[in-house]
């Protein structure tokens, strides 16, 4: 693989090219799904290709190919330069890159069981056993289970001398149970909605999340929701369990801190950002107990945003995004860091394949834990609603006004959970919501959730992001009904 990168890089005219990098990516994926006791899908995919990014006359050019013959490698390198030249004819200003040190390294994400050492039959058997447990519950109409595994090896070479060989292994799985009664459709998902839990781990993740052992309980909750009362409307204290809070972080913090959105370089997919440059270090984003970091280091955990180096060869870092409630940092690239006067990128550039140019993407955007136990948090809540597991979301194109629907709620009165609620929702304004946070559970309740399907860019790119959170309480939040059924 390294030969292909070296060959492409050698075809560039170093006198003309201000900077260039080459990524050779080899990937392997397996996806298996089941539906009501039958196999839904079993797909495997392998890919090998190369992308060249060149900075010429102050503008980027990018080209890619999966034809790795010498002639094709030369052609793709020249095409990247030609695209940069053409782009320079319409440039407003020259692109400047923040400095970065040369890196030579090899890194493989740790795992205990190579997921690809397991057979399709073994994978299918696990999903079908979980499916059977869920369908054994009277009143369950539909059960869907899924398992995903991916291994990506990337060779990165740059004209600055960096040479990085990086391999990441990701595994994910989940189950969704549905109950239909008349016009009322209720759903419970585990460990999370939208495909479950994904982490930078091997097949050992399946032992940890215990799909088979939990499937029946989740199905029983889906059926029980039909008898639950609708979520009351009004202003209440809201406790969000950690997976829902993870999505809240993703949408109302993660996307608006992407510096390309702030600078107007990205708008088509998910909009721009309310976090204009004047707000950096001047905005009270949340209450004093709200501390949010962007942390791609393995020390933070095996998240989907964990790596050793980003796709510009910048080492993984931890960056304070919100410190004691104050907005303190963006997600940046070498280009955008230089544009706002920062000395260095904080290493967030990633592409979802060899045929896509790197973009600023969330790493692990996490709310740091507090000091509460969940039992104590509930006991100290006189009138509130505990909401679990995302079902829907909506947020405006500047990431400021939002509404989320959840699968299940619990009404809390005088410190006790008194009744199940169905179709709960809550809405608010980003900074008002985070400033209303008055309690966060401790490390024992903290989970690093994986979001495997974050979209950005045109052509569209799908990226996995991580979000660490523990249950937290927010005061005086508008709550109501997400679905009328």
Where are these regions (language model features)?
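N-terminal small-residue-enriched
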Residues: 1-485
């Amino acid at each position: 693989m390294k030969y292909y990168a070296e060959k492409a890089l050698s075809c560039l005219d170093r006198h003309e090219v201000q900077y260039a990098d080459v990524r050779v990516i080899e990937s392997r994926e397996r996806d298996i799904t089941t539906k009501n006791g039958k196999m839904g899908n079993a797909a495997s995919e392998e890919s090998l290709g190369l992308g060249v990014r060149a900075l010429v006359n102050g503008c980027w050019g990018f080209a890619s190919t999966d034809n790795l013959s010498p002639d094709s490698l030369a052609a793709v390198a020249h095409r990247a330069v030609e695209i940069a030249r053409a782009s320079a004819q319409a440039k407003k200003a020259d692109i400047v890159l923040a400095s970065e040190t040369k890196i030579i390294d090899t890194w493989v994400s740790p795992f205990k069981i190579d997921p690809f050492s397991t057979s399709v039959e073994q994978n299918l058997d696990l999903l079908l056993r979980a499916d059977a447990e869920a369908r054994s519950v009277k009143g369950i109409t539909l059960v869907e289970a899924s398992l995903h595994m991916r291994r990506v090896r990337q060779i990165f070479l740059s004209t600055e001398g960096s040479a990085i060989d990086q391999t990441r292994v990701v595994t994910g799985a989940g189950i969704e149970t549905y109950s239909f009664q008349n016009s009322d459709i209720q759903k419970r998902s585990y460990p999370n909605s939208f495909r479950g839990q994904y982490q930078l781990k091997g097949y050992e993740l399946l032992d940890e999340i215990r799909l088979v052992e939990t499937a029946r309980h989740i199905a029983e909750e889906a059926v029980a929701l039909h008898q639950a009362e609708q979520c009351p409307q009004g202003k209440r204290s809201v406790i969000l369990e950690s997976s829902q809070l993870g999505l809240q972080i993703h949408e109302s913090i993660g996307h608006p801190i992407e510096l390309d959105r702030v600078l107007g370089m990205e708008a088509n997919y998910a909009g721009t950002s309310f976090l204009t440059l004047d707000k950096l270090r001047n905005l009270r984003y949340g209450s004093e107990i709200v501390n949010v970091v962007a942390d791609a280091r393995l020390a933070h955990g095996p998240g989907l945003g964990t790596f050793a180096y980003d796709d510009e060869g910048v080492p993984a870092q931890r960056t304070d995004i919100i410190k004691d409630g104050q907005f303190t940092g963006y997600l940046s690239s070498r280009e955008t860091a230089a544009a706002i006067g920062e000395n260095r990128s904080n290493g967030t550039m990633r592409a979802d394949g060899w045929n896509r140019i790197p973009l600023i993407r969330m790493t692990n955007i996490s709310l740091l834990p507090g000091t509460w136990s969940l039992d104590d948090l509930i006991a100290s809540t006189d009138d509130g609603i505990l909401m679990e597991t995302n079902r829907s979301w909506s947020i405006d194109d500047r990431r400021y006004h939002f509404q989320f629907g959840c699968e299940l709620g619990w009404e809390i009165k005088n410190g006790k959970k008194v009744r199940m609620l169905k179709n709960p929702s809550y809405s608010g304004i980003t900074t008002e919501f985070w400033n209303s946070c008055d309690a966060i559970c401790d490390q024992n309740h903290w989970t690093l959730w994986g979001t495997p399907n974050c979209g950005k860019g045109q052509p569209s790119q799908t990226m996995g992001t991580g979000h660490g959170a523990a249950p937290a309480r927010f005061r005086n939040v508008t709550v109501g009904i997400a679905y009328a059924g």
